[in-house]
Amino acid sequence: MVLVTGATGILGRVLVLELLKKGKKVRAAKRKSSNIEEVKKSWLFYTADAERLFEQIEWVDVDLWDLDSLRAALDGVEEVYHASAKVSFHPKDAQEMLRTNVEGTKNMLYIAEEKQVKKFLFVSSIAVLDEVNENGIIDENSQFNPKEEHSGYAQSKYLAEMEVWRSSAEGMNTIIINPGVIIGTGNWGNSSGELFTTFEKNSFTFSGGTAYVDVRDVAK
């Protein structure tokens, strides 16, 4: 059994789909307020077999601060894909991001260790990587530089990574990935999908650049 957190998010929903296509049994964690029908609708952009695959999902409501809720969600689970996160670059959301991204991850790891999960994959972000290589590119060897200024989101993801590294040092099999801005189909009004409508309505240019990645590439 595989548990995917943030299963209704831009990455989580496609990750669930890819795992099901590989024949995995998937338990998908969501909030009580999540709209799973919207997830199924978005799958129509990715597969012609959306209805059949969607019926195979075991949905479970999870509260990252309720340890009993996490124990129930992780019961019988061998692999965890922790894609749940609060994403914001507004200062007012800094404390909420610390609570969700750091404390929530810490709780997930605690119960995963208790349940002897065999693999824990944490979805971090390119936002925590600062140092570039000799070609001026951020790569797998790039590190977080605490002397540089960072957004509250980047700080929360870095601190969450430290919790994952702690679990790794204690013997858990962990993986951290750091994707760029994830772009997906079928979520035009949410998450990074808003970029398309924003650029369409307000044509402008800006200096510099950033890293974008197709959600299907991240999920695979």
Feature annotation, model-predicted:
Residues 170-171, 184-195:
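Glycine/proline-rich active-site loop of Rossmann-fold NAD(P)-dependent oxidoreductases
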Residues 24-35:
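Conserved glycine-rich Rossmann-like NAD(P)H-binding loop of the short-chain dehydrogenase/reductase
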Residues 134-177, 181-182, 203-205:
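Catalytic helix-loop patch of NAD(P)-dependent Rossmann-fold dehydrogenases
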Residues 2-22:
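N-terminal Rossmann NAD(P)H-binding glycine-rich loop of SDR-like oxidoreductase domains
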Residues 159, 190-191, 206-220:
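Substrate-positioning beta->alpha
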Residues 44-45, 50-100:
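NAD(P)H-binding glycine-rich loop region in Rossmannoid oxidoreductase-like domains
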Residues 25, 94-95, 99-152:
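Conserved Rossmann-fold NAD(P)-dependent oxidoreductase catalytic core, especially the SDR/UDP-sugar
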